[in-house]
Amino acid sequence: MSALRDEALATLRAWRPPSARQAALRREYVDHLAAHPDGTERSCPGAHVTAGALILSADRASVLLTLHAKARRWFHMGGHLEPQDGSLAAAALREATEESGVAGLALDPEPLHLDAHDVAFCGEHPSVRHLDVRFLARAPEGAVHAVSEESIDVRWWPVGDLPDDAAELREMVDAALARAQTPSTSDATSDPTAASSSRAI
């Protein structure tokens, strides 16, 4: 997935972090990808890049979260990159669609938020650091969701009343609300092929 690694590097280098903490995480991600040609693959030991999306309701009042079957906690939609993913944005849109069951998601191709965390249930490795790149996905009016095999439950949560075990999502939700209120210079897309050719600015 060297082409995907190159795309991820280009996207992260072009992204303007909104805070010093996010800038430090971007440096960590870029350094990791520069040092590891397989840094986007789940087989990369120690750490690898993942992608996901926070799904915002059409009225911007709720976010769609999944109760992860292994972690038993509420998360945004996301997961590992796959060889067919043409970009980080395409991977995020694929994961969001697969895990939520929502058709017609519109994904902003510019990264929204970064978060690095250790995961104890990632395949054959006892502990792996996930370098997660999160995007904003907007659900259409009347969106219908479903529970995937990776989840116990999928549910809409008011943006002001997140689950108790998802307090760390607050920063990302706030970033999503701010992004949703600002006219975007990038075109949102519900087409993974289009997302793979979109460039963050």
Give, region by region, the residue ranges found by the protein language model.
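Predominantly extracellular/luminal regions of secreted and cell-surface proteins
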Residues: M1-E28, S100
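Conserved Nudix-box catalytic region and its N-terminal flanking loop in Nudix hydrolases
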Residues: A61-V102, G160
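Active-site segment of metal-dependent pyrophosphate-handling enzymes
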Residues: G101-A143
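NUDIX/MutT-family hydrolases
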Residues: R134, H145-A176
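Intrinsically disordered, low-complexity terminal tails and inter-domain linkers enriched
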Residues: T182-I201
